[in-house]
Curated annotation (Swiss-Prot):
Function: Heme-dependent dioxygenase that catalyzes the oxidative cleavage of the L-tryptophan (L-Trp) pyrrole ring and converts L-tryptophan to N-formyl-L-kynurenine. Catalyzes the oxidative cleavage of the indole moiety.
Short name of one Pfam family: Trp_dioxygenase
Entry keywords, A to Z: Dioxygenase, Heme, Iron, Metal-binding, Oxidoreductase, Tryptophan catabolism
Enzyme class: oxidoreductase
Chain residues that bind substrate: 57-61, 128, 328
Reaction catalyzed: L-tryptophan + O2 = N-formyl-L-kynurenine
Protein name: Tryptophan 2,3-dioxygenase
Gene: v
EC number(s) from the headed UniProt entry: 1.13.11.11
Length: 380
């Protein structure tokens, strides 16, 4: 079967088919396979004590880094599209497509961990001494992914030093780190986008006011139902549960409470952005909110998959070196990695918690004709 990327069939002297007459590059030249396939330098081989599984270790991590590069490429393009005052529907569709691509890449990376686990702890010990002081903590691209996604420096777990210190005097790496910290992250850009959600305007549909009224009516109906409970302890339990729910809703309706939660690190979005996310969730069946809802869902998928990847990495490290040893780069190994599984590393934490504030479908404020027309004719 001929290569689908071939041109008119003209061959080089070695029998290879060029991509096209114009470019004049064969498959290996185009992909620079001479460099790519010659980049596996086994230190155990150089030491005249070759360890077979070191090759797998190198290949697996190089594959990770290649996919990290693609994720960064996608994130950067998405950030450019989001960094506009008005995002039309065609761009929203493209953003959704590229986020979905990142999701599929991350699924692949999660599934790649078991391949590395075919190596036993004893096999790993045979060449582990060659790795120091190298460490996965020194993966520049993974740090860039975290920063571009929206992991804040103050949210990071401290273990020995500032995370960027591991790059020493590497000016290129330090410049990339600073740029990723200073530029608008996906979290910041998505927040700005959500703040512009049509229907939040107080002089217009004023969704937030209507939502508060619906919640008050919903809770009042719950109280009336609880008061009819004939069993005293059951009635008191239901009333107590309703009061707890009222406090939960107060945390989103009271801006001061919300801001306190943001400062504490328990929330990420601004108050208005959270309103936009809730509105999109309620009216996701509306044509204009369909793609935005997909976008928010994909952001949660990305967060979830990165957490799954971290978890798989933690389990693999525990299998390979146990839970007491230091990592090859001097980090606290398993203990440090386990600490990164907390919600502090979940960038779009607020999206995961939206279900806390849902109300029954029949209690959702109905859209009036004005906002329906706005959702049909205006980009989000």
């Amino acid at each position: 079967m001929s290569c689908p990327y071939a041109g008119n069939g003209n061959e080089h002297d070695d029998g290879a088919v060029p991509l096209s007459n114009e470019v004049g590059k064969i498959y290996g030249e185009y992909l620079m396979l001479d460099k790519l396939l010659d980049a596996q330098c086994m230190l155990s081989m150089e030491d005249k004590r070759p360890v077979h599984d070191e090759h797998l270790f190198i290949i697996t991590h190089q594959a990770y880094e290649l996919w990290f590069k693609q994720i960064i490429f996608e994130f950067d393009s998405i950030r450019v599209m989001l960094d506009e005052e008005v995002i039309d529907e065609t761009k929203t569709l493209e953003i959704v497509k590229r986020l979905n691509r990142v999701v599929l890449i991350l699924k692949l990376l999660v599934d790649q961990v078991p391949i590395l686990e075919t190596m036993t702890p004893l096999d790993f010990m045979d060449f582990r001494k060659y790795l120091a002081p190298a460490s996965g903590f020194q993966s520049l691209q993974f740090r860039l992914i975290e920063n571009k996604l929206g992991v804040l420096t103050e949210q990071r777990v401290k273990y020995n030093q500032k995370y960027s210190d591991v790059f020493g005097n590497d000016e290129r790496a330090l410049h990339a780190i600073r740029s990723s910290e200073d530029g608008p992250s996906l979290l910041v850009l998505v927040q700005r986008w959500l703040e512009r959600t049509p229907g939040l305007e107080e002089e217009g549909f004023n969704f937030w006011s209507k939502f508060q009224q619906s919640v008050d009516q919903f809770l009042a109906a719950q109280v009336q139902s609880a008061l009819l409970e004939p069993v005293e302890w059951a009635k008191n339990y239901r009333l107590m549960d309703i009061e707890k729910r009222r406090e939960v809703y107060r945390s989103i309706f009271d801006p001061a409470v919300h801001e306190a939660l943001v400062k504490r690190g328990d929330r990420r979005f601004s108050h208005r952005a959270l309103q936009g996310a809730i509105m999109i969730t309620f009216y996701r069946d509306e044509p204009r909110f369909s793609q935005p809802h997909q976008l928010l869902t994909l952001l949660m998928d990305i967060d979830s998959l990165i957490t799954k990847w971290r978890y798989n990495h933690v389990i693999m490290v525990q299998r390979m070196i146990g839970s007491q040893q230091l990592g090859t780069g001097g980090s606290s190994g398993y203990q440090y990695l386990r600490s990164t599984l907390s919600d502090r590393y979940k960038v779009f934490l607020d999206l995961f918690n939206l279900s806390t504030f849902l109300i029954p479908r029949e209690a959702i404020p109905p859209l009036d004709e004005t906002i329906r027309k706005k959702l049909v004719h205006k980009s989000v």
